[in-house]
Amino acid sequence: MTTIVSVRRNGQVVIGGDGQATLGNTVMKGNVKKVRRLYNDKVIAGFAGGTADAFTLFELFERKLEMHQGHLVKAAVELAKDWRTDRMLRKLEALLAVADENSSLIITGNGDVIQPENDLIAIGSGGPYAQAAARAMLENTELSAREIVDKSLNIAGDICIYTNHFHTIEELPSKA
């Protein structure tokens, strides 16, 4: 899988992800960009799971953002509804971490839209390691959101065999 981490702190929201794509036990590519900007650079999103599935979901999510004039929560709920009820979409295996200046959300294929505690998201195979690292840094340091994301991804990459040290990190100003 992968590791995606999102942290919101001191007027910034950041999502970062590693770049490893695997097929079974083999690393197929080390520089996949699993984090991208959507909706005129007002939303950032990262995916964990199947790459082709995630690109399909990014496309669908961007359409939902357009339909709802960039309203993140409405777009996420509508995507989750479609994902849960459409037979073809139900087969897609991925998780999305999405954020704008106001909200951070996890969108799952089960139709869940989750607003995480403390605006900290960590998904994918390395998610638990990155979450523990990020939480410790949030509680015990004054590091920026970007520094916390980068260091958390490095720690996950040291522990999780499905996470590497090629990072894509995007950030936005945050009101929350």
UniProtKB/Swiss-Prot annotation:
Allosterically activated by HslU binding. Keywords: Allosteric enzyme, Cytoplasm, Hydrolase, Metal-binding, Protease, Sodium, Threonine protease. Its main location: cytoplasm. It is an enzyme of class 3 (hydrolase). The keyword Hydrolase applies. GO terms for cellular component: HslUV protease complex; proteasome core complex. GO terms for molecular function: metal ion binding; threonine-type endopeptidase activity. Pfam families: Proteasome. GO terms for biological process: proteolysis involved in protein catabolic process. Disulfide bonds: none annotated. It is found in: Cytoplasm. A double ring-shaped homohexamer of HslV is capped on each side by a ring-shaped HslU homohexamer. The assembly of the HslU/HslV complex is dependent on binding of ATP. This is ATP-dependent protease subunit HslV. It comes from Serratia proteamaculans (strain 568). The gene is hslV.
